[in-house]
Curated annotation (Swiss-Prot):
SUPFAM superfamilies: a domain/subunit of cytochrome bc1 complex (Ubiquinol-cytochrome c reductase), Transmembrane di-heme cytochromes. The gene is MT-CYB. It is found in: Mitochondrion inner membrane. The keyword Heme applies. Its cofactor is heme b. It comes from the Eukaryota. This is Cytochrome b. GO terms for biological process: mitochondrial electron transport, ubiquinol to cytochrome c. Binds 2 heme b groups non-covalently. Keywords: Electron transport, Heme, Iron, Membrane, Metal-binding, Mitochondrion, Mitochondrion inner membrane, Respiratory chain, Transmembrane, Transmembrane helix, Transport, Ubiquinone.
């Protein structure tokens, strides 16, 4: 693999001929990132990080700023697109064994954590009712940390409750973290090009490679065009599809919403958090639901890289996908039967996938007589 990264600027990167549509999501994520930075910049020009003015400034953007409604909707729905693409990107990595390129995988999961933090801070900025209460519930989890919890929470809030200093620092963090995402993305791409992309067969593709441009770049454009078309269709016809009705009311610390929940892309982690009736246990499970992705490269025992010819792993993978969807759905429901037991069962199944990987790999080696 050439070490001259300048080649990548001209699309001369050698790529396997047989990579499928599932490899398109990297370029789609890059497009989402560019869109978010651009729309975010124009929104930041008109936004006011003050608890008395934040909600009004969002109304001002959508009503008075030329194309402000489009910028605001593109930014909000673009975030959902970003998470759809990144979850598919990670699922592809799990299915085809891309995680065996350890440095690339580690940088990717770090990117995911940074992205989740950025999205969380961004959700608080409109200072709507759900923004305020979601921020209160999630930041309050820091109090579960032994000894340091109360001090950490007070330090994060900038006071003894969520107030003006909290909003100011959340806006500052939401503005600065995308630059960290851009840096990590560059690192992710450099590390990927060091070893090269994997492929659906999991074999060494060095004998059969073609330049990224024009072959794969044109293939990427198809799905990219579809994504942009879908994004603008939702912005034009269903702009509030991902919004919570409570967030159309200004934050009121005296009135608690009937059901506090974050944006849909955090619901799987929130569902795992709620399924454990203990604050510290729930907070640990929430953190572990993401952090467990770091251990995957070290628990791979199968001799074959992708799951294409590994039926047991395939079964567990599709169980994970359905589990992810079920936890997300259950997290939108109130904490009452039967949703409690559904959340607890699916949370156990979620972690079972990661813990069973080494055993399944070993069993599949035995089934195929691969020593």
């Amino acid at each position: 693999m050439p070490h001259h990264y300048i080649l990548t600027l001209f699309g001369l990167l050698p790529v396997a001929t047989n990579i499928s549509t599932w490899w398109n999501f990297g370029s789609m994520l890059l497009t989402c990132l560019a869109l978010q930075v651009l729309t975010g910049f124009f929104l930041a020009i008109h936004y006011t990080a003050n608890i008395n003015l934040a909600f009004s400034s969002i109304i001002h953007i959508t009503r008075d700023v030329p194309y402000g409604w489009m910028m605001q909707n593109l930014h909000a729905i673009g975030a959902s697109m970003f998470f759809i693409c990144i979850y598919i990107h990670i699922a592809r990595g799990l299915y085809y064994g891309s995680y065996l390129n350890k440095e690339t995988w580690m940088s990717g999961i770090t990117l995911l954590i940074t992205l989740m933090a950025t999205a969380f801070f961004g959700y608080v900025l409109p200072w709507g009712q759900m923004s305020f209460w979601a921020a209160t519930v999630i930041t309050n989890l820091l109090t579960a940390v032994p000894y340091l919890g109360x001090s950490l929470t007070t330090w994060l809030w900038g006071g003894f409750a969520i107030n003006d200093p909290t909003l100011t620092r959340f806006f500052a963090l939401h503005f600065i973290l995308p630059f960290a995402i851009i840096s990590l993305s560059s690192l992710h791409i450099i590390l990927l090009h060091e070893e090269g992309s994997s492929n659906p067969l999991g074999t060494n593709p060095d004998i059969d490679k073609i330049p990224f441009h024009p072959y794969h770049s044109h293939k990427d454009l198809l799905l990219l065009t579809f994504m942009i078309l879908l994004l603008f269709t939702i912005v034009s016809f269903l702009p509030d599809i991902f919004n919570d009705p409570d967030n159309f009311s200004k934050a009121n610390p005296l009135v608690t919403p009937q059901h506090i929940k974050p944006e849909w892309y955090f619901l799987f982690a929130y569902g795992i958090l709620r399924s454990i009736p203990n604050k510290l246990g729930g907070a640990l499970a929430l953190v572990m639901s993401i952090m467990i992705l770091f251990i995957i490269p070290f628990t791979h025992t199968a001799r074959l890289r992708p799951m294409t010819f590994r039926p047991l792993s395939q079964l567990m993978f599709w169980t994970l996908v359905s589990t992810f969807a079920t936890i997300t759905w259950a997290a939108t429901k109130p904490v009452e039967p039967p949703f409690i037991i559904i959340s607890q069962t699916t949370s156990m199944l979620y972690f079972t996938f990661f813990l069973s990987t080494p055993i399944l790999g070993w069993m599949e080696n035995k089934m195929m007589n691969i020593s």
